[in-house]
Protein backbone atom coordinates (compact mmCIF):
# COMPACT_ATOMS: atom_id res chain seq x y z
CA UNK A 1 0.00 0.00 0.00
CA UNK A 2 1.32 3.45 -0.94
CA UNK A 3 -0.02 6.68 0.53
CA UNK A 4 0.54 10.02 -1.18
CA UNK A 5 -0.40 13.32 0.45
CA UNK A 6 -1.53 15.42 -2.52
CA UNK A 7 -2.29 18.60 -0.59
CA UNK A 8 -3.14 19.27 3.03
CA UNK A 9 -6.12 17.09 3.93
CA UNK A 10 -6.17 15.13 0.65
CA UNK A 11 -4.68 11.65 0.74
CA UNK A 12 -4.36 9.22 -2.18
CA UNK A 13 -3.90 5.51 -1.42
CA UNK A 14 -2.75 2.89 -3.91
CA UNK A 15 -4.08 -0.40 -2.58
CA UNK A 16 -7.13 -2.50 -1.78
CA UNK A 17 -9.66 -0.34 0.05
CA UNK A 18 -10.75 -3.37 2.10
CA UNK A 19 -7.31 -3.25 3.72
CA UNK A 20 -7.39 0.53 4.19
CA UNK A 21 -10.74 1.36 5.80
CA UNK A 22 -9.37 0.71 9.29
CA UNK A 23 -6.76 3.44 8.73
CA UNK A 24 -9.24 6.12 7.72
CA UNK A 25 -11.07 8.59 9.97
CA UNK A 26 -14.83 8.31 10.34
CA UNK A 27 -16.54 9.61 7.19
CA UNK A 28 -19.17 12.28 6.81
CA UNK A 29 -19.52 11.31 3.14
CA UNK A 30 -18.92 8.02 1.33
CA UNK A 31 -18.93 8.31 -2.45
CA UNK A 32 -19.13 4.74 -3.74
CA UNK A 33 -18.61 4.44 -7.49
CA UNK A 34 -17.55 0.81 -7.74
CA UNK A 35 -18.36 -2.09 -10.09
CA UNK A 36 -21.60 -2.00 -12.07
CA UNK A 37 -21.49 -5.57 -13.33
CA UNK A 38 -21.41 -4.52 -16.98
CA UNK A 39 -17.90 -5.77 -17.84
CA UNK A 40 -16.96 -2.13 -18.32
CA UNK A 41 -13.36 -2.25 -17.12
CA UNK A 42 -10.67 -4.64 -15.96
CA UNK A 43 -11.88 -6.27 -12.75
CA UNK A 44 -15.56 -5.45 -13.25
CA UNK A 45 -18.08 -8.27 -12.99
CA UNK A 46 -19.48 -9.42 -16.32
CA UNK A 47 -23.08 -9.26 -15.08
CA UNK A 48 -24.82 -7.64 -12.07
CA UNK A 49 -25.70 -11.05 -10.59
CA UNK A 50 -22.76 -11.17 -8.15
CA UNK A 51 -22.81 -7.53 -7.07
CA UNK A 52 -24.41 -8.16 -3.67
CA UNK A 53 -21.70 -10.62 -2.67
CA UNK A 54 -18.97 -8.35 -4.07
CA UNK A 55 -20.14 -5.25 -2.21
CA UNK A 56 -21.05 -6.83 1.13
CA UNK A 57 -17.53 -6.83 2.68
CA UNK A 58 -17.17 -3.17 1.71
CA UNK A 59 -20.58 -2.27 3.13
CA UNK A 60 -19.68 -4.10 6.34
CA UNK A 61 -16.54 -1.97 6.69
CA UNK A 62 -18.38 1.26 5.86
CA UNK A 63 -20.90 0.45 8.57
CA UNK A 64 -18.20 0.04 11.24
CA UNK A 65 -16.96 3.60 10.75
CA UNK A 66 -20.19 5.36 9.74
CA UNK A 67 -22.01 7.62 12.20
CA UNK A 68 -25.54 9.10 12.17
CA UNK A 69 -23.98 12.06 10.33
CA UNK A 70 -22.73 9.89 7.46
CA UNK A 71 -24.31 10.03 4.00
CA UNK A 72 -23.60 7.34 1.41
CA UNK A 73 -23.92 8.13 -2.29
CA UNK A 74 -24.11 4.81 -4.15
CA UNK A 75 -23.52 4.99 -7.91
CA UNK A 76 -24.64 2.17 -10.18
CA UNK A 77 -27.05 1.04 -12.85
CA UNK A 78 -30.70 0.66 -11.91
CA UNK A 79 -30.48 -3.15 -11.74
CA UNK A 80 -27.12 -3.04 -9.96
CA UNK A 81 -28.53 -0.82 -7.24
CA UNK A 82 -31.65 -3.00 -6.91
CA UNK A 83 -29.45 -6.04 -6.30
CA UNK A 84 -27.26 -4.32 -3.68
CA UNK A 85 -30.07 -2.48 -1.84
CA UNK A 86 -31.02 -5.42 0.45
CA UNK A 87 -27.40 -5.65 1.65
CA UNK A 88 -27.36 -1.95 2.50
CA UNK A 89 -30.58 -2.38 4.48
CA UNK A 90 -29.10 -5.40 6.25
CA UNK A 91 -26.32 -3.21 7.64
CA UNK A 92 -28.61 -0.42 8.82
CA UNK A 93 -28.47 1.98 5.88
CA UNK A 94 -31.68 3.93 5.33
CA UNK A 95 -32.76 4.78 1.78
CA UNK A 96 -33.46 8.48 1.22
CA UNK A 97 -33.88 8.95 -2.53
CA UNK A 98 -32.72 7.82 -5.96
CA UNK A 99 -31.05 10.50 -8.06
CA UNK A 100 -30.83 9.95 -11.81
CA UNK A 101 -27.95 11.17 -13.94
CA UNK A 102 -29.51 11.96 -17.33
CA UNK A 103 -26.68 12.14 -19.89
CA UNK A 104 -28.97 13.27 -22.70
CA UNK A 105 -29.58 11.99 -26.21
CA UNK A 106 -26.05 12.87 -27.33
CA UNK A 107 -24.84 9.95 -25.22
CA UNK A 108 -26.42 7.40 -27.56
CA UNK A 109 -26.99 9.28 -30.81
CA UNK A 110 -26.32 6.88 -33.68
CA UNK A 111 -24.85 4.23 -31.39
CA UNK A 112 -27.83 2.17 -30.24
CA UNK A 113 -29.30 -0.78 -32.15
CA UNK A 114 -32.74 -0.87 -30.55
CA UNK A 115 -33.94 -3.57 -32.95
CA UNK A 116 -31.38 -5.97 -31.53
CA UNK A 117 -31.56 -4.77 -27.91
CA UNK A 118 -35.39 -4.58 -27.81
CA UNK A 119 -35.39 -1.73 -25.33
CA UNK A 120 -35.10 2.04 -25.31
CA UNK A 121 -31.66 3.68 -25.40
CA UNK A 122 -30.15 3.98 -21.91
CA UNK A 123 -28.82 7.42 -21.03
CA UNK A 124 -28.91 7.17 -17.24
CA UNK A 125 -27.08 6.03 -14.15
CA UNK A 126 -28.30 6.31 -10.58
CA UNK A 127 -26.72 7.89 -7.53
CA UNK A 128 -28.70 6.68 -4.53
CA UNK A 129 -28.61 8.54 -1.23
CA UNK A 130 -28.48 6.55 2.01
CA UNK A 131 -27.92 7.57 5.63
CA UNK A 132 -26.83 5.52 8.63
CA UNK A 133 -29.78 5.23 10.97
CA UNK A 134 -29.10 6.26 14.56
CA UNK A 135 -29.59 3.44 17.06
CA UNK A 136 -29.37 3.31 20.85
CA UNK A 137 -28.47 0.61 23.36
CA UNK A 138 -31.40 -0.45 25.53
CA UNK A 139 -31.00 -3.40 27.91
CA UNK A 140 -28.53 -5.08 25.60
CA UNK A 141 -30.53 -4.46 22.41
CA UNK A 142 -30.37 -1.86 19.66
CA UNK A 143 -33.47 0.32 19.38
CA UNK A 144 -34.42 3.11 16.99
CA UNK A 145 -34.37 6.77 17.93
CA UNK A 146 -38.17 6.82 17.85
CA UNK A 147 -38.41 3.94 20.33
CA UNK A 148 -35.56 5.22 22.52
CA UNK A 149 -37.26 8.58 23.06
CA UNK A 150 -40.44 6.87 24.25
CA UNK A 151 -38.58 4.38 26.43
CA UNK A 152 -36.56 7.11 28.12
CA UNK A 153 -39.64 9.21 28.81
CA UNK A 154 -41.47 6.20 30.22
CA UNK A 155 -38.62 5.77 32.70
CA UNK A 156 -39.35 9.22 34.16
CA UNK A 157 -42.71 7.99 35.46
CA UNK A 158 -44.50 10.97 33.92
CA UNK A 159 -47.34 10.79 31.37
CA UNK A 160 -46.50 11.64 27.78
CA UNK A 161 -48.74 14.70 27.98
CA UNK A 162 -46.00 16.32 30.06
CA UNK A 163 -43.73 16.38 26.99
CA UNK A 164 -45.95 19.16 25.64
CA UNK A 165 -45.41 21.15 28.82
CA UNK A 166 -41.67 20.54 28.54
CA UNK A 167 -41.64 21.92 25.00
CA UNK A 168 -44.07 24.77 25.74
CA UNK A 169 -46.50 23.58 23.06
CA UNK A 170 -50.16 22.55 23.04
CA UNK A 171 -49.77 19.03 21.63
CA UNK A 172 -46.90 19.06 19.12
CA UNK A 173 -44.57 16.96 21.27
CA UNK A 174 -46.96 14.04 21.76
CA UNK A 175 -48.21 14.36 18.17
CA UNK A 176 -44.76 14.49 16.51
CA UNK A 177 -41.81 13.56 18.73
CA UNK A 178 -43.34 10.83 20.89
CA UNK A 179 -45.99 9.32 18.64
CA UNK A 180 -45.86 5.65 17.66
CA UNK A 181 -47.24 6.25 14.19
CA UNK A 182 -45.66 7.13 10.85
CA UNK A 183 -46.05 10.86 11.54
CA UNK A 184 -43.12 10.76 13.98
CA UNK A 185 -40.07 12.83 13.29
CA UNK A 186 -36.90 13.70 15.14
CA UNK A 187 -37.30 16.60 17.59
CA UNK A 188 -35.21 19.66 16.69
CA UNK A 189 -32.19 20.20 18.91
CA UNK A 190 -33.75 23.09 20.84
CA UNK A 191 -36.84 21.00 21.63
CA UNK A 192 -34.71 18.01 22.63
CA UNK A 193 -32.82 20.27 25.03
CA UNK A 194 -36.10 21.28 26.70
CA UNK A 195 -37.27 17.66 26.92
CA UNK A 196 -34.02 16.57 28.57
CA UNK A 197 -34.05 19.44 31.07
CA UNK A 198 -37.67 18.78 32.06
CA UNK A 199 -37.16 15.02 32.41
CA UNK A 200 -34.12 15.41 34.64
CA UNK A 201 -35.80 18.05 36.79
CA UNK A 202 -39.18 16.38 37.28
CA UNK A 203 -38.57 12.68 36.61
CA UNK A 204 -38.17 9.98 39.26
CA UNK A 205 -34.97 10.52 41.21
CA UNK A 206 -33.85 6.89 41.02
CA UNK A 207 -33.87 6.88 37.22
CA UNK A 208 -31.61 9.86 36.60
CA UNK A 209 -29.91 10.78 34.34
CA UNK A 210 -32.53 10.59 31.62
CA UNK A 211 -31.72 10.73 27.90
CA UNK A 212 -28.13 9.71 28.51
CA UNK A 213 -26.04 7.43 26.29
CA UNK A 214 -23.19 6.98 28.74
CA UNK A 215 -25.27 6.52 31.89
CA UNK A 216 -23.53 9.47 33.55
CA UNK A 217 -24.67 12.69 31.90
CA UNK A 218 -27.70 13.63 29.79
CA UNK A 219 -27.19 14.30 26.09
CA UNK A 220 -26.73 17.95 25.19
CA UNK A 221 -28.16 20.01 22.36
CA UNK A 222 -24.82 19.67 20.56
CA UNK A 223 -24.83 15.88 21.03
CA UNK A 224 -28.30 15.69 19.49
CA UNK A 225 -27.28 17.74 16.47
CA UNK A 226 -24.73 15.01 15.68
CA UNK A 227 -27.45 12.35 15.56
CA UNK A 228 -28.65 13.23 12.06
CA UNK A 229 -26.93 13.49 8.65
CA UNK A 230 -25.94 16.80 7.17
CA UNK A 231 -27.94 18.03 4.20
CA UNK A 232 -27.56 21.37 2.48
CA UNK A 233 -30.25 21.59 -0.19
CA UNK A 234 -29.14 23.53 -3.27
CA UNK A 235 -31.71 25.87 -4.80
CA UNK A 236 -33.41 24.64 -7.96
CA UNK A 237 -31.90 21.12 -7.97
CA UNK A 238 -34.13 18.03 -8.23
CA UNK A 239 -33.32 14.31 -8.22
CA UNK A 240 -32.83 14.34 -12.02
CA UNK A 241 -29.36 15.62 -12.93
CA UNK A 242 -29.18 16.51 -16.60
CA UNK A 243 -25.49 16.74 -17.46
CA UNK A 244 -23.82 15.49 -20.62
CA UNK A 245 -21.26 12.69 -20.58
CA UNK A 246 -17.70 14.02 -20.43
CA UNK A 247 -16.18 14.94 -23.77
CA UNK A 248 -13.75 17.71 -22.83
CA UNK A 249 -10.38 18.05 -21.12
CA UNK A 250 -11.93 16.79 -17.89
CA UNK A 251 -12.11 13.30 -19.41
CA UNK A 252 -9.10 11.20 -18.38
CA UNK A 253 -7.64 9.39 -21.38
CA UNK A 254 -4.84 7.02 -22.27
CA UNK A 255 -3.95 8.04 -25.77
CA UNK A 256 -7.25 8.50 -27.56
CA UNK A 257 -9.17 6.04 -25.38
CA UNK A 258 -11.07 6.98 -22.21
CA UNK A 259 -9.59 5.35 -19.12
CA UNK A 260 -13.08 4.78 -17.67
CA UNK A 261 -16.32 4.97 -19.64
CA UNK A 262 -18.40 6.04 -16.64
CA UNK A 263 -16.14 8.80 -15.31
CA UNK A 264 -18.33 11.24 -13.39
CA UNK A 265 -18.39 15.00 -14.08
CA UNK A 266 -16.76 17.07 -11.33
CA UNK A 267 -20.00 19.08 -11.25
CA UNK A 268 -21.90 16.06 -9.89
CA UNK A 269 -19.15 14.95 -7.51
CA UNK A 270 -18.93 18.46 -6.11
CA UNK A 271 -22.70 18.61 -5.74
CA UNK A 272 -23.05 15.50 -3.60
CA UNK A 273 -20.09 16.43 -1.39
CA UNK A 274 -21.36 19.97 -0.82
CA UNK A 275 -24.90 18.73 -0.13
CA UNK A 276 -23.84 16.37 2.65
CA UNK A 277 -20.76 17.82 4.34
CA UNK A 278 -19.10 20.96 5.64
CA UNK A 279 -15.56 22.25 5.36
CA UNK A 280 -12.95 19.93 6.96
CA UNK A 281 -15.31 16.93 7.03
CA UNK A 282 -13.97 13.53 5.94
CA UNK A 283 -14.94 12.20 2.49
CA UNK A 284 -14.25 8.61 1.43
CA UNK A 285 -13.86 7.64 -2.22
CA UNK A 286 -13.01 3.93 -1.86
CA UNK A 287 -13.11 3.13 -5.58
CA UNK A 288 -11.30 6.22 -6.85
CA UNK A 289 -8.82 4.14 -8.87
Please report, for each region that a protein language model flagged, where it lies by residue.
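Core catalytic lobe of class I
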Residues: 3-288
